[in-house]
């Protein structure tokens, strides 16, 4: 009887301790990220919700669907509003949206989100700071 109880105690101890080492992966949803090459005048952003992503690409708002599998990310069905803007801004926006369509992997390191394309290009975002509410 003592051996059975000791065996059960060991099983419960191992099961109980195994839960301590598992980490909940950080999520990318519900946060706004700003492209690190953004300027004060043009802030390129990306946000993630359930299966959708959206943001501002310098001139237009954009949106689409995404899927995650481990470190792999697929952005699809990318669309945007159709506003016109300065030529340079439109060219940068085109390059950015084209890169989004080629994203294959992602990394989340604290407040930094790195999207890597099939050609190895990295889009590095910082989590946007939430504005303080004035009292």
Q: Which positions does each model-derived feature cover?
A:
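Sec-dependent N-terminal signal peptides
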Residues: 4-14
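Lipid interaction determinants
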Residues: 17-135
């Amino acid at each position: 009887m003592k051996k059975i109880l000791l065996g059960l105690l060991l099983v419960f101890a191992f099961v109980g301790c195994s839960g301590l080492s598992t980490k909940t992966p950080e999520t990318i949803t519900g946060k706004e990220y700003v492209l690190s090459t953004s300027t004060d005048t043009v802030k390129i952003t990306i946000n993630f919700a359930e299966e959708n992503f959206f943001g501002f690409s310098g001139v237009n708002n954009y949106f689409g669907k995404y899927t995650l599998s481990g470190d792999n990310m697929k952005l699809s069905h990318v669309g945007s509003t159709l506003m016109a803007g300065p030529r340079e801004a439109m060219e940068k926006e085109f390059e950015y949206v084209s890169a989004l369509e080629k994203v294959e992997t992602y990394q989340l390191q604290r407040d930094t989100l790195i999207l890597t394309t099939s050609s190895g290009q990295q889009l590095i975002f910082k989590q946007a700071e939430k504005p303080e509410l004035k009292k």
